[in-house]
Amino acid sequence: MTTLINRPNTALVVIDVQNGVVGEAYNRDNVVANIASLIDKARAADVDVVWVQDSGAGARDSEGWQLVSELSRREGEPLVQKDFADSFEETDLESILAERSVGQLVVAGAQTDECIRSTLHGAIARGYDATLVADAHTTEDLSEWGAPTPDLVIAHTNLYWSNHAAPGRTAGTVNSADVDFTIAPGV
């Protein structure tokens, strides 16, 4: 249960699903399709969809900076512009969530080992419950620089987040097919 008072609502947070971020990402098409399914489920359940866009993914308004063509933000859905891996750092994400009485986050997007991890930890540290959708996040292959392969990065993140906890807050993972936004609070 979130430690945030009077914040019973859930939001789907879609992080950095931009051409320049996921263009070469592992399992890109399946992950984007799973995110599209989550967006449809959230909208059908009248759950807020909050978009996060990395301003470092290329020049603003460039092709690389744009959200992928398979996903479309609706008018009125918040768009958070960020410069740091944690989507809360120096952005209006917290105020957007507070306005909507959100205390539970369902997180999807990219990059697993950067912005996904940082935002999940930032959410828990700020009092949110945070659920990672296990098959709806991805990363690029950085193994030539000594990183594990993307499938291992994703699997490791899913493993440790499925067991993460903090006083008064919940964390966990769920597959996109099992997300049910009609069950309060969260999935």
What would you call each of these model-derived segments?
Residues Y26-N27:
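Conserved GNAT-fold acetyl-CoA-binding loop/helix
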Residues V13-V17:
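N-terminal nucleotide-binding beta1-loop-alpha1 segment
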Residues T2-A11, A33, S37-D40, A44-A45, ...:
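Active-site-adjacent betaalpha module
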